[in-house]
Amino acid sequence: FDIKYIDKNGEEKTAKSFTNTKQGEGYKNEVVIRLDQPIEAKELKLCNFVAEAAEWNNIGILEMEVYSNDQAEQGATLDSVVEAIEAESKTIAADVDTLEMPVVPAGFSVKLNGADFEQIIGDNGKIVHPLTDKTVKVSYVVTETATGKGKETKDVDYIVKGTKTQADGKNAKPTVIPEIQEWYSDSTEKIAVSSLKTVTYTDDKLKDVVDEFVSDYEDFTGIKLTAKKGGAEANAFNFELKAPDELLGEEGYTMDIQKDRINVASVDTTGNMYGMQTILQMYKENNERYNVGQMRDYPRFETRGFLFDVARKPVSLEMMKEVTRTMRYYKMNDFQAHLSDNYIFLEDYGKGAQENEAFKAYE
């Protein structure tokens, strides 16, 4: 049969000629027809039927629906499309720099919901490959075009190939908390703790955290480091304010441990500061030498912290400072102090002139 229409000028045109598919002893009783091009029509009709009949015409049309947008393929549902994506586990080759979106049936759309490691797969689909192979969990949002309904997929595992391959028998990743995200070493050499005498930094913004690091390092090791602004040099911890790549972020950093120096780089002072905490923890693991190797480190979770209830029992300010300093050591970034359960409005705070009248604030 033909699908014909009357356009806005009153002219009759053929939109599509269609031949139905045999099914059993007859033909499919539900068909979806997609036009090659969009049309604007005042009227639409089916005509020029070619019927198969023994003694009578046997064509009947129960219902015809016309849509201005693509409809889902028969048999495809929002749930089935989501399940199909969840069933896929993929490997992203080392030469791929943009995430390939899943293919979905006509009538559905899909967009990236996010990855657990945004420092490897960014919100825009940009990929920065890790040092060695790493599993990244990715989620999508699938939308049914006809209804506008959407559904998130579960996390789908993607193996993102690394830029390097770790060989057996080389230096192991330092043990720190939280675990270093990426590590690579092609060496068995070490750098002696005693050989590191200086700290350099490239930007005045780093001075405060460098001074804190010098103080902390002396507390940990007994070694008094000399800090100075300038470029990287041998026998030194060298801190640089620059972006190692597009996705590492303010809290991420790279560390290159060489035979005669340790270089740390981050786009922000925070990342450099976290690199310093890693060095302090590395000393706790081995107080004589550091393993030569490279790391690319970053947090998995944006907020990492806890609530400290200091309302039930008084806690000294020094104690709270010690708690927050320990948090920094473990790269935690969110501290909330619960000070009081008193339900007192601000304007009633000073209602009583004397200390023994404090409870008047509740009145």
Question: What is each of the regions a protein language model found here?
Answer:
Residues 1-14, 27-73:
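Aromatic, loop-rich ligand-recognition surfaces of beta-strand-rich domains
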Residues 14-23:
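Solvent-exposed serine/threonine-rich low-complexity stretches and specific carbohydrate-binding patches
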Residues 27, 38-40, 93-95, 130-134, ...:
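Solvent-exposed loop and beta-edge segments used for protein-protein assembly and interaction
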Residues 50-52, 140-146, 268:
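Surface-exposed loop/turn motifs at beta-strand-loop junctions within extracellular Ig-like
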Residues 248-363:
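Feature activates predominantly on carbohydrate-active enzymes
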